[in-house]
A protein has these predicted regions:
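Glycine-rich anion/phosphate-binding loops
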Residues: 88-105, 141-157, 276-287
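Glycoside hydrolase catalytic-domain groove-lining segments
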Residues: 237-263
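Active-site loop segments of alpha/beta catalytic cores
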Residues: 114-117, 136-245
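Active-site clefts of carbohydrate-active enzymes
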Residues: 254-278, 307-316
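Active-site beta-loop-alpha junctions enriched in small/polar residues
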Residues: 120-122, 176-178, 213-217, 234-236, ...
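A short, acidic, amphipathic alpha-helical segment used as a generic capping/interface helix at domain edges
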Residues: 240-247, 273-298
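Glycine-enriched alpha-helix->loop->beta-strand junction motifs that scaffold or abut catalytic
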Residues: 30-31, 223-230, 251-257
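Alpha/beta catalytic barrel-like cores
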Residues: 1-136, 255, 273, 287-293, ...
Length: 353
């Protein structure tokens, strides 16, 4: 097994907090803590901006809060990049681009069963960053080739830094944009992405993790060569029988699944309880077990429990038309984190972990 999961708790990296220490304390309260990404602290803490550090051709537009890619600048900076591409410091996350990461590394992290980092994946980054013609850089073959290698190296440098603090470290690749490849309009289809991604994943050091909070195709994701999958389990509503075989095979090979079962929209979280969510997750697992024969206890042993998504904006308040509550997103995340511990305890007792 990649790690001893046993229904332990973790969460995705992005948090709405503007207080670094408060966010860190919440993250460090989980079984597998992580370093938070806090875009409300600074644009440098944004997941895309952090990943862009030292990528040729990219500048930050602080006024518009976005990254800008210039094809001409890319060509100008390529030669210098090639001279530095084998140097680890080219890929290290500096204090300027994440005060939080350095603060996380300054803590004593040896006592945890594992610790985790994250990095924006090449597909999401490639779709998000546009050139001067507003075309995603994933369609620029030269930029795309460098991008996959660049992010792979950044993930590996981060992994080594985390491993120095805890031997059971891992970095998962955050890929909210991976769902785009199933759109017939994307021009970068699922098969092309699968080939690129498999090679990318194989070059990652340590446990190979992937996080996706968009609509998911579990069999597709589980065939990418990963060892840890984190996904929004709440939004699927039920476990399709057609997915059971793929999930079972993944777990039989020692894989770990982080089930994002706690919703982070206020209107939905309001009507949920830890007991109801634990029951929902148990029902998913029963579908897998009933259709494959895989023991429920094994599924639980190889499960992590997490929020469904990050919460930078409370969609629940927007859709219900309620008045805005100060720091409502922070309160939602804190409530979701408290649910995690209770759900974990319920499942550990149920499956005698």
């Amino acid at each position: 097994m990649i790690l001893q999961a046993n229904c332990g708790t973790t969460a995705m990296g992005i948090m709405p907090h503007s207080d670094i220490e408060q966010a860190l304390e919440l993250a460090l309260g989980l079984d597998i803590p992580f370093w938070p990404q806090l875009p409300n602290v600074s644009l440098y803490e944004d997941m895309y901006v952090q990943t862009s550090e030292h990528f040729p051709g990219i500048t930050i537009d602080f006024e518009r809060g976005r990254l800008v890619f210039s094809t001409a600048r890319f060509q100008e900076e390529l030669e210098d990049y090639y001279t530095k591409m084998e140097h680890p410091e080219t890929y290290a996350l500096t204090t300027e681009y994440s005060r939080v990461f350095k603060k996380f590394l300054s803590r004593d992290l040896q006592g945890y069963k594992a610790i985790r980092g994250q990095i924006t994946g090449p597909v999401s980054f490639g779709f998000k960053v546009l050139d001067e013609t507003f075309k995603p850089i994933i369609y620029n073959e030269e930029a795309k080739t460098i991008l996959f290698d660049f992010i792979q190296k950044k993930a590996n440098v981060q992994y080594q830094e985390l491993k120095a603090k805890n031997q059971n470290a891992f970095v998962w690749v955050d890929e909210p944009g991976l769902g785009y490849v199933f759109s017939g309009l994307s021009g970068y289809n699922d098969q092309h992405a699968k080939e690129d991604y498999y090679n990318f994943i194989q070059g990652l050091e340590g446990p190979k993790g992937l996080h996706l909070c968009a609509d998911v195709n579990l069999p597709y994701l589980l065939e990418l060569g990963i060892e840890i999958l984190s996904f929004d389990a709440f939004q699927i509503g039920f476990m399709p029988k057609e997915y059971a075989g793929s999930v079972s095979e993944f777990l039989k090979k020692g894989g770990v699944i982080s089930w994002g079962i706690v919703p982070t929209e206020s209107s939905i979280l309001l009507i949920q309880t830890p007991e109801k969510l634990a029951s929902t997750l148990s029902n998913y697992w029963e579908v897998i077990s009933d259709n494959t024969g895989l023991a429920l206890r094994q599924i639980a042993e190889q499960a992590l429990i997490a929020p469904a998504r990050c919460c930078l904006r409370d969609i629940g308040t927007e859709t219900t038309g309620k008045c805005e509550i100060p720091n409502v997103e922070e309160k939602i995340v804190e409530k979701a984190f408290s649910f995690l511990q209770e759900i974990s305890q319920i499942l550990r007792e149920k499956f005698e972990l």
